[in-house]
């Protein structure tokens, strides 16, 4: 998730085709009625006492109650409960499903409105040992309602002191309409980001030491919706709630 942001607009680039040698190795279709806790963990509360506001001055409290399943989708329900009190859900695959290299993709429909901040992202599995940002972070999808029609794709590393300098924001006029496919193609040399199979950003540094390239280890998935915060924006439109983040599926090819 973001702290300081240096950005550039990027037009959609080349399209993507799955290499023939890759196979589907894991999928989460969200076709059940409960979350599969063999693969998923809940992260609860407001981040306190260690990282209050989840490190970004976010307003929401995460609960197990703010999710449901509808028409084969996971639904994260973002609610306003009284004055300046918001609830949401955050889930991870830490310690259960972790992956190194391949194509990771999610099909999702984002919530909208000023103050909303949905994300599908990954953290290095060694985070408890080395901390953030040395563990590395891959933001496959981030959207903030204060900047409509734009998607953010980013990386965080020790070299950037956690700041989001390895990033692009891409204008997609219909991104708030219906479902879209967000993906990365991750190899030992590069990470390329895609929206609806169109390339939007590639990170391929010449230097690949542990501070620049912590992406040579397994990472785990995180799905959440934050409210407000340093990146989501402190000017929250209280009239937009409730909001829903719909996730159809996640698939990993290697």
Spans of model-derived segments:
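GH16 jelly-roll
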Residues: 18-254
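Bacterial Sec-dependent N-terminal signal peptides
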Residues: 1-20
